[in-house]
Amino acid sequence: METTKYEITYIIRPDLDDAAKTALVERFDKILTDNGAELINSKDWSKRRFAYEIGGFNEGIYHVITLNATDDKGLNEFDRLAKINDSILRHMIVKRED
């Protein structure tokens, strides 16, 4: 099977304490690895101010994951759970061409 490189960027609520944020990141990293993805990098980008209010917040913590996957099983599960998680304000999954 051919491996495809993806990048996931998601925005975490700024009012989460460090322990809750770490648990959230570890949980979503585990969702990907449990479904066959290989994480290359998972790191906080920065806390950034929004151009407009999202979910009652004016800023959020951006987190970026770079990964390799042979299928979309892990990505679909990540997408499904990120949509229903109140701590993730927005997320985006893109296929990298490099």
From Swiss-Prot:
Job description of the protein: Binds together with bS18 to 16S ribosomal RNA.
Q: Which HAMAP family match?
A: Ribosomal_bS6
User: Where in this chain does the entry annotate a coiled-coil region?
Assistant: none
Pfam families hit by this protein: Ribosomal_S6 (PF01250)
Q: Which organism is it from?
A: Levilactobacillus brevis (strain ATCC 367 / BCRC 12310 / CIP 105137 / JCM 1170 / LMG 11437 / NCIMB 947 / NCTC 947) (Lactobacillus brevis)
- GO MF: small ribosomal subunit rRNA binding; structural constituent of ribosome
Q: Which keywords has UniProt assigned to this entry?
A: Ribonucleoprotein, Ribosomal protein, RNA-binding, rRNA-binding
Tell me its family. Answer: Belongs to the bacterial ribosomal protein bS6 family.
Q: NCBIfam families attached here? A: S6 (TIGR00166)
Q: Which GO terms describe its biological process?
A: translation
Q: Which CDD domains match?
A: bS6
Can you list the GO cellular component terms from the UniProt entry?
Answer: cytoplasm; ribonucleoprotein complex; ribosome
What is the protein's name according to its record?
A: Small ribosomal subunit protein bS6
- Give all cystine bridges in this chain: none
Keyword Ribonucleoprotein in record? yes
